[in-house]
Amino acid sequence: MKTLVTYFEPFGGRNTNASKEVVSLLSDYDIKELPVSWNKIESIIDEILSNDLDYLFLIGESGKYEEITVERTAHNICNGKDNYGVAKDNEPISGGPEELKTKFNLDNLPYCISDDAGKYLCNYTYYLALSKAKNTKVVFVHLPYINDNLDHLKNDLLSIIKSLTRKDN
């Protein structure tokens, strides 16, 4: 069972990113850093999905959440300025439907489930991965900012990954 867990570099002038801090602790999984770049992310997603993965877990950080949140839906919209100065102003992602949903069944997860991955690069990356994944199950998980909750977030993320990759899901 080939699984990749990704995280984002810090963005928005912050020195760290909760996704990087937590995912770097997952020693049993292949991990990869993603840039916060509108122009670079599509080719990276293409490269990732060319590796015949069974599962792709995209992990990001959001200050709007106080707890770990699993995103069910990605929307066809981009907004905000990336780390390289490229800005999007509520622009649609070309050639796709209004929204895409994960193929994972999230109904029995004991975590917050959201249908709004935002408009920034988390959503864009998720939308691209869902639209391009043929035989790979993809899901996005947002982490809150880290305070004294690093171990708790790591354990919750591991629980989500293990729950979703069980054969019966």
Regions found by a protein language model. Name each.
Residues 1-119, 130-135, 145, 149-168:
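N-terminal catalytic or cofactor-binding beta/alpha core of small enzyme domains
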Residues 125-126:
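Active-site-adjacent betaalpha module
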